[in-house]
């Protein structure tokens, strides 16, 4: 029979790097690319199980939590926030692409193009080159210079095996709280529990 120390030792993931390797191997089998494995603290008190996971910079709308086959899974996506200049570039790109599509729809027929090709070819090339130069200048002005880039973005996932303590927990009492980048999951323990089920003979 496992002691309380054994249970806590398993839950707290003391060997963090080995746990990361195990989770990465599971993710590979599911063909899911995981960019972030968030750190976690697990505490068992006399009346509850407390799971704290650091998810700084992540919106609660991008977090999913579920329990399946005694495995608690916390997953989601940490998206990169765009500043005003980057948002403006995205808008300009979308506007340029839509303008290009409109211009293609309004293209002249072959006959009209052949009649006007000689007098308009030089001015058209010059105008196009000028527009491209202006766009390059605007992009250069709007682009930011990054000196340090250490933050991680992308998909995150963390598993917690509850097999050894699941019989003690009241899953109907699960409570979650997300504040200041810290996700706290609290599960109350049952008032009366046992890891042994007595079977009567009829």
UniProtKB/Swiss-Prot annotation:
InterPro entries: A-crystallin/Hsp20_dom, HSP20-like_chaperone, HspG1-11-like. Keywords: Stress response. CDD domains: ACD_sHsps-like. SUPFAM superfamilies: HSP20-like chaperones (SSF49764). It comes from the Eukaryota. Residues 31-202 form the sHSP domain. PROSITE patterns: SHSP. Induction: Down-regulated by Pseudomonas aeruginosa, PAO1 strain and PA14 strain infection. Residues 96-138 are annotated as: Disordered. Pfam families: HSP20. Belongs to the small heat shock protein (HSP20) family. This is Small heat shock protein hspG5. The gene is hspG5.
């Amino acid at each position: 029979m496992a002691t309380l120390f054994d249970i806590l030792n398993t839950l707290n993931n003391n060997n963090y790097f080995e746990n990361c390797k195990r989770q990465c191997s599971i993710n590979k089998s599911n063909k899911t690319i995981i960019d972030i494995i968030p750190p976690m603290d697990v505490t068992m008190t006399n009346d509850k199980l407390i799971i704290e996971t650091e998810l700084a910079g992540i919106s609660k709308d991008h977090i999913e939590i579920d329990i399946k086959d005694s495995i608690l899974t916390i997953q989601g996506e940490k998206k990169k926030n765009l500043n005003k200049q980057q948002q403006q570039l995205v808008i300009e790109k979308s506007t340029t692409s839509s303008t290009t599509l409109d211009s293609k729809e309004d293209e002249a027929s072959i006959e009209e193009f052949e009649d006007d090709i000689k007098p308009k070819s030089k001015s058209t090339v010059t105008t196009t080159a000028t527009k491209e130069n202006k766009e390059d200048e605007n992009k250069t002005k709007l682009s930011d210079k990054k000196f340090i880039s250490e933050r991680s973005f992308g998909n995150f996932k963390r598993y917690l095996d509850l097999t050894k303590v699941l019989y003690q927990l009241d899953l109907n009492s699960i409570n979650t709280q997300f504040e200041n980048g810290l996700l706290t999951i609290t599960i109350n323990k049952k008032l009366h529990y046992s890891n042994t089920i007595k079977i009567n003979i009829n």
